[in-house]
Amino acid sequence: MKISKTKTPKLVLIAGPCVIESLDNLRGIAIKLQPLANNERLDFYFKASFDKANRTSLESYRGPGLEKGLEMLQAIKDEFGYKILTDVHESYQVSIAVKVADILQIPAFLCRQTDLIVEVSQTNAIINIKKGQFMSPKDMQYSVLKALKTRDKNIQNPTYENALANGVWLCERGSSFGYGNLVVDMRSLKIMREFAPVIFDATHSVQMPGGANGKSSGESSFAPILARAAAAVGVDGLFAETHIDPKNALSDGANMLKPNELESLVTDMLKIQNLF
């Protein structure tokens, strides 16, 4: 896979539900995503979490867990031929998750966790590091460098080119804006793209953390607007959570797009890419 700094031959698309609810639910979403997965202009990855370890409330659904969750992701991989992204929260999960996942994701709250970044970087998986809501875009270069130096001890400074070559990506998902809200500073896309490929997370960027009495809320209607803006600034890919029935999703339903909405958004982003 090649990602160009100025005009992406293939837009990376990472899409799927927030959390694994059931195999039937995963299959239903995977079927709906087939038109996007088969689009020759996209480099598609199916995503889902086996455990949402940072839910606001202890009572909130977390997922099926590591073993059962990975079994279900492997089933999707086998049936549809999709490449897989899943996130890891603890170092011990890495050696198990990498048997299924093509991309291992570092959650935003853990983007400075050296041991976790190093553990993932010792695998052959692409590492997608989410920018913490509390982090400046410039400071994300140090998380990138942790991964790069683990994979190539001769690297002294992170660049887009050496991060691309070593499979180290960053993901923008918004910054804290007071209590219970996020805002996207589009300058961060340009800043971080100086030292790594950048994926824009459109759906988590419209999250309202803790805004619904023990649950996070969100405003999914703004996700396409921000994604189109990100495409105009220049990004290497789109991360978007999708669900057939967002209102009844077990996690982050308020942020998610329906598959047909996602398909329309991706069409817009590809058109915008053609302008530059």
Swiss-Prot record:
Known pathway: Carbohydrate biosynthesis; 3-deoxy-D-manno-octulosonate biosynthesis; 3-deoxy-D-manno-octulosonate from D-ribulose 5-phosphate: step 2/3; Bacterial outer membrane biogenesis; lipopolysaccharide biosynthesis
Cellular component, GO, one term: cytoplasm
Position of the signal peptide: none
GO MF term (any one): 3-deoxy-8-phosphooctulonate synthase activity
EC numbers for this chain: 2.5.1.55
Location(s), subcellular: Cytoplasm
Keywords: Cytoplasm, Lipopolysaccharide biosynthesis, Transferase
PANTHER family: PHOSPHO-2-DEHYDRO-3-DEOXYHEPTONATE ALDOLASE (PTHR21057)
Protein name: 2-dehydro-3-deoxyphosphooctonate aldolase
Organism expressing this protein natively: Helicobacter acinonychis (strain Sheeba)
Gene (UniProt): kdsA
